[in-house]
């Protein structure tokens, strides 16, 4: 058995405080001028209208780590003592179309983080759990898989981060670097410029495309989030930002990009190409072109961080995932920029809050946990020593993974968890460091079904937060006391407990190509056929209704092609029909008509707003009641909707 790839591994991780000190010692000379830079003049502005996602993010099933793509069923029973051997039939990197790299039974394809999942594969095994076997030519011919995986494990499905048609940002939002990153992911443009030291920002990765340009999802292209969000954060810290064109992962191209940018900058920030994968080569380029001071920080997110020098220019290599990049910048880089710019440290604001849901961690690295706030009191808080019943913020985790652009836009602050801590229990007091002193909890927090009617209600409120994570999530988190209101569709097996504030009916069924072709007139037409079907994910009220319909009709879901692959957003299945990737998709009449598709009706489903019984006198609930009194007016423009 012979290793065939030259992967650099993380060995001695730097303490976060030592990493901050190393960055503070970099030669960052002050530069006071302020100028406008394309794309970034929206930071600090107030959003005037709602922004809906026009695309799925990501637009393809994406590998979440370096390893091998395979069929999960082939790994059944695999472990360290009894590995499963698979034939290697290809290699696939980020930014490449799968081509002939297709996975069949007993086969695997080597895949880099962020690459498109090859056809036939439904899971990823990390490289750390693989033994590569070389042929006589030195190329990998087979792999021994030392762990079993489940379908979808280590895979980020298309639309898992943000689904087309979902409400991304609401009117009245102050655009911070978090929101700028989200807008960049959606293809929007612009932010204001103000800074002092000259800071260069360079993204790496062949898969990155500037916002505003079309994406080729078949090649795994995504909008360049980091260039926009990191540049915005550097300006906010006081830097004059110089943006550079995206560089490929090729070592020589990276070296040329660094050589070209460094002389004009006091500090050069890159994102991506810093981890231990074979394609990620910045650490080697930095060693050859300058001085590598450290590689790897005991921080999560943020482990694959680089610090070094390129001549007289300081250098920091940020991780490629947007959340990781922004966390490292905020924690380690921004203080050094502010010091060089002569700016005082910003006023820090923190609050003591009660954690509503448990949080579990792997010990060994300091954890930065994004959290949201709900301003309320609780019986537990009063019993714990607050006899006056003063308002105490409640907090809940919003971490959706380092690759999810929305994690920070949904958050109000961070909880720093010590490296030795592995569990924080519900009800524990935690310190939340707010993203700014101006942060306030939303006027109303709603969690539940992704529904156009609920979105219309939220738009009529001042500063709400609506997390369209599905009926099951809304019910579960309402039981934990997280939202003010749960959006519940249908009759979930475990119903929400609380008063019904408002309700409406929505017409649901199948979205089909325009003209309602005769080959899909009912759900029965899909059973046993080879017609591809686009479904919603489990946890959606619509998905539960369709499951019940099939059960009542005696139809095995396994006989419907694609039934088990769930999409996240309520418009996602219909959009698959629109692009020709599905013959039918589960959805709403409102969606089908908006996209000029045909529609096969199945009936109506009731959607309810269920209030948190412990927050009946909250100000947001009173405002919501006033809005729901106008429910017929709010729903009038949504086809297939009627107030109950």
Label each PLM-derived region with a short phrase.
Residues 2-189, 351-354, 417:
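Phosphate-interaction motifs
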Residues 62, 285-435:
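Flexible glycine/proline-rich
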Residues 154-270, 274-275, 442-470, 476, ...:
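Phosphate-binding glycine-rich loops and their immediate beta-loop-alpha structural context
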Residues 398-473, 482, 523, 632-644:
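N-terminal hydrophobic or amphipathic helices and topogenic motifs
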Residues 456-461, 538-563:
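Ligand-binding cleft/hinge of the Venus flytrap
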Residues 505-507, 597-632, 636, 642-644:
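Periplasmic-binding protein-like
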Residues 512-533:
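Flexible hinge/capping segments at coil-to-helix
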Residues 527, 531-552, 628-644:
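Ligand-binding clefts/hinges and TM-proximal coupling segments of bilobed small-molecule sensing domains
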């Amino acid at each position: 058995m012979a290793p065939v790839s030259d992967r650099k591994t993380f060995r001695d991780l730097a303490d976060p405080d030592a990493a901050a000190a190393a960055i503070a010692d970099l030669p960052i000379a002050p530069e006071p001028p302020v100028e406008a830079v394309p794309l970034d003049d929206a930071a600090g502005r107030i959003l005037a209208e709602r922004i809906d996602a026009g695309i799925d993010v990501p637009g393809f099933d994406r590998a979440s780590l370096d390893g091998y793509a395979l069929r999960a069923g082939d790994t059944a029973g695999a472990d360290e003592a009894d590995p499963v051997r698979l034939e290697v039939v290809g290699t696939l990197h980020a930014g490449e179309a799968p081509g002939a790299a297709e996975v069949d039974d007993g086969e695997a394809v080597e895949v880099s983080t962020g690459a498109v999942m090859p056809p036939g594969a439904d899971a990823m095994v990390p490289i750390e759990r693989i033994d590569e076997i070389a042929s006589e030519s030195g190329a990998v011919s087979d792999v021994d898989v030392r762990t079993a995986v489940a379908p979808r494990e280590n895979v980020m499905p298309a639309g898992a981060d943000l689904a087309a048609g979902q409400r991304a940002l609401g009117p009245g939002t102050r655009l911070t670097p978090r929101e700028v990153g989200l807008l960049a992911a959606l293809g929007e443009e612009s932010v204001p410029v103000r800074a002092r030291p000259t800071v260069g920002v360079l993204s790496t990765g062949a898969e990155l495309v500037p916002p505003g340009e079309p994406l080729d999802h078949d090649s795994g292209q995504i909008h360049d989030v980091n260039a926009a969000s990191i540049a915005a954060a550097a300006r906010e810290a006081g830097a004059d930002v110089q943006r550079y064109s995206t560089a490929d992962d090729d070592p020589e191209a990276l070296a040329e990009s660094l050589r070209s940018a460094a002389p004009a900058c006091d500090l050069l920030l890159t994102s991506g190409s810093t981890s231990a994968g074979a394609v990620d080569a910045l650490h080697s380029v930095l060693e050859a072109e300058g001085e590598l001071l450290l590689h790897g920080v005991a921080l999560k997110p943020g482990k694959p961080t680089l610090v070094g020098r390129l001549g007289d220019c300081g250098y920091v290599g940020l991780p490629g995932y947007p959340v990781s990049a922004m966390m490292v910048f905020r924690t380690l880089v921004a203080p050094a920029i502010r010091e060089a710019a002569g700016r005082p440290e910003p006023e820090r604001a923190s609050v003591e809050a009660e954690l509503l849901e448990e949080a579990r961690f792997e010990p060994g690295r300091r954890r930065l946990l994004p959290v949201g706030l709900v301003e309320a009191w609780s019986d537990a808080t009063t019993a714990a020593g607050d006899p006056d019943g003063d308002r105490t913020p409640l907090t809940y985790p919003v971490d959706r993974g380092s690759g999810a652009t929305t994690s920070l836009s949904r958050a109000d602050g961070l909880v720093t968890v010590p490296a030795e801590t592995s569990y924080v229990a519900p009800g524990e007091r935690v310190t939340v460091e707010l993203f700014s002193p101006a942060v306030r909890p939303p006027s109303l927090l709603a969690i539940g079904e992704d529904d156009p009617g609920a979105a219309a209600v939220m738009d009529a409120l001042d500063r709400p937060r609506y997390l369209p994570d599905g009926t099951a999530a809304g019910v579960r988190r309402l039981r934990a006391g997280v939202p003010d209101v749960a959006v519940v569709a249908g009759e979930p097996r475990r119903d929400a407990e609380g008063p019904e504030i408002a309700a409406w009916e929505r017409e649901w069924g199948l979205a089909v190509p325009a003209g309602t072709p005769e080959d899909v007139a009912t759900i029965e037409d899909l059973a046993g056929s080879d017609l591809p079907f686009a479904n919603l994910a489990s946890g959606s009220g619509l998905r539960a209704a369709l499951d019940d319909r099939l059960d009542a009709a005696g139809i095995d879901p396994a006989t419907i092609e694609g039934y088990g692959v769930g999409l996240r957003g309520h418009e996602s299945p219909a959009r698959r029909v629109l692009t020709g990737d599905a013959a039918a998709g589960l959805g709403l009449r409102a969606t089908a008509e908006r996209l000029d598709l045909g529609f096969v009706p199945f009936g109506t489903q009731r959607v309810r707003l269920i209030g948190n019984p412990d927050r009946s006198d909250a100000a947001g609930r009173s405002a919501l009641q006033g809005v729901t009194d106008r429910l017929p007016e709010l729903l009038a423009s949504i086809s297939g909707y009627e107030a109950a």
